[in-house]
Amino acid sequence: MSQQVIIFDTTLRDGEQALQASLSVKEKLQIALALERMGVDVMEVGFPVSSPGDFESVQTIARQVKNSRVCALARCVEKDIDVAAESLKVAEAFRIHTFIATSPMHIATKLRSTLDEVIERAIYMVKRARNYTDDVEFSCEDAGRTPIADLARVVEAAINAGATTINIPDTVGYTMPFEFAGIISGLYERVPNIDKAIISVHTHDDLGLAVGNSLAAVHAGARQVEGAMNGIGERAGNCSLEEVIMAIKVRKDILNVHTAINHQEIWRTSQLVSQICNMPIPANKAIVGSSAFAHSSGIHQDGVLKNRENYEIMTPESIGLNQIQLNLTSRSGRAAVKHRMDEMGYKESEYNLDNLYDAFLKLADKKGQVFDYDLEALAFIGKQQEEPEHFRLDYFSVQSGSNDIATAAVKLACGEEVKAEAANGNGPVDAVYQAINRITDYNVELVKYSLTAKGHGKDALGQVDIVANYNGRRFHGVGLATDIVESSAKAMVHVLNNIWRAAEVEKELQRKAQHNENNKETV
């Protein structure tokens, strides 16, 4: 009988560390709800002690996610564990994940400590975490470079202290699959109480071996795999969860394990993470790349037409990729749009039908036919822009040519007031951005600009993603339109609204802090 492998997602913690701009609370919640829908068993959603923003994100997700166990990271430090517990206590059940380095190099040069002191600290902190929850995960940082005898000592002590999951990370992506499997097997041989905990693995892709190492560990007895959607993460990234999940499904014959994942949600979750994180998926990416199910060789095409199993070990439908694209027109009613969203697997809570239908009609008037990918793009943008807006693009006009200096005129609604400015620039997009900067006096510095076609043909929607720097912080913005100058302008307005909202949140936090201080003085 096959055993279950627990899927532990760290897209919102380890994965976010790869992003040029931090995600907002709303963006993190959107990803968390998608991960819950996909069926991940555990989701690590932040490092609460690191910032008030991370604390708020963890607390918000812990309050709303019900079907996945929410987890927060904490160093083996009292304050870390206490703050993690405080952020998670709104959940019915939660996990605290605490860690400390165990390799000789890390102990000597980073911690300036000894193995005995590390073990003593690990025991104390695991017990402290157990005061808050019966679900405690302990990680041996840099386990891949820790001598097996030392690693076994730490693991045995952590389990005796109450750790219910023991995580073995290949922190720097150093080990080979056969070597990593040997570490897991070695622990099963050396740790007498190992049956009292789940053995987990967390691999990095520095040598391109993250997925291979995780699967080798599963074959050797690990029963939890940690990773991120699309493999995002520090340096070369984390283990790609979608690849591990589908490998377990496709090669059940040799691994004899299974997951509780809803495979039909893989593709949509992957796309959402890509869009929100502004990290395009390479065409040749396994499982979710646009070429993953494409066949260009004549021999392959002939074989697939005769029997798909000749060259396909899984189907697009098995990951929720519906290749039949139906089109709607401006004559399609609200019910038709809702029906199509239902067929694509969207719940009404995931989008605002009124806003989506209004955007659909405007797009249908421009391009005639609206396809599935158009609807998904409109729903995504609508979700991003549901929060209150201080800035709104009222009007823009650009003039440019091969021998002319680009000029833009922009009207921007700023609260209740509409302001207008004109500016020149190095091209129409730059001219629009210069005009917007004049209106707001924010002096936003553009760090990254990317344009992605959503759909096919000359009338495809253009999605612009930008990262901008303001007062030492980076903010992400996204815009969508058939006109790339318009989508560029919308992306910058989205950035401005994110800056404004961040300032409002900061004011509210200061107000609460002052209120608490006043209450202390009264007492």
Curated annotation (Swiss-Prot):
Domain of life: Bacteria
UniProt pathway annotation: Amino-acid biosynthesis; L-leucine biosynthesis; L-leucine from 3-methyl-2-oxobutanoate: step 1/4
Segments of this protein annotated with the region Regulatory domain: 392-523
Pfam families: HCS_D2, HMGL-like, LeuA_dimer
Keywords: Amino-acid biosynthesis, Branched-chain amino acid biosynthesis, Cytoplasm, Leucine biosynthesis, Manganese, Metal-binding, Transferase
Cofactor(s) demanded: Mn(2+)
Record SUPFAM superfamilies: 2-isopropylmalate synthase LeuA, allosteric (dimerisation) domain, Aldolase
Catalyzed reactions: 3-methyl-2-oxobutanoate + acetyl-CoA + H2O = (2S)-2-isopropylmalate + CoA + H(+)
Residues that bind Mn(2+): D14, H202, H204, N238
InterPro entries membership: 2-IPM_HCS-like, 2-isopropylmalate_synth_dimer, AIPM/Hcit_synth_CS, Aldolase_TIM, LeuA/HCS_post-cat, LeuA_allosteric_dom_sf, LeuA_bact_synth, PYR_CT
Disulfide bonds: none
One GO biological process term: L-leucine biosynthetic process
Molecular function GO terms recorded: 2-isopropylmalate synthase activity; acetyl-CoA C-acetyltransferase activity; manganese ion binding
Pyruvate carboxyltransferase domain ranges (all copies): 5-267
Family affiliation: Belongs to the alpha-IPM synthase/homocitrate synthase family. LeuA type 1 subfamily.
Biological function: Catalyzes the condensation of the acetyl group of acetyl-CoA with 3-methyl-2-oxobutanoate (2-ketoisovalerate) to form 3-carboxy-3-hydroxy-4-methylpentanoate (2-isopropylmalate).
Quaternary structure, from the entry: Homodimer.
Designated name of the protein: 2-isopropylmalate synthase
Upper taxonomic lineage: Bacteria, Pseudomonadati, Pseudomonadota, Gammaproteobacteria, Enterobacterales
The encoding gene: leuA
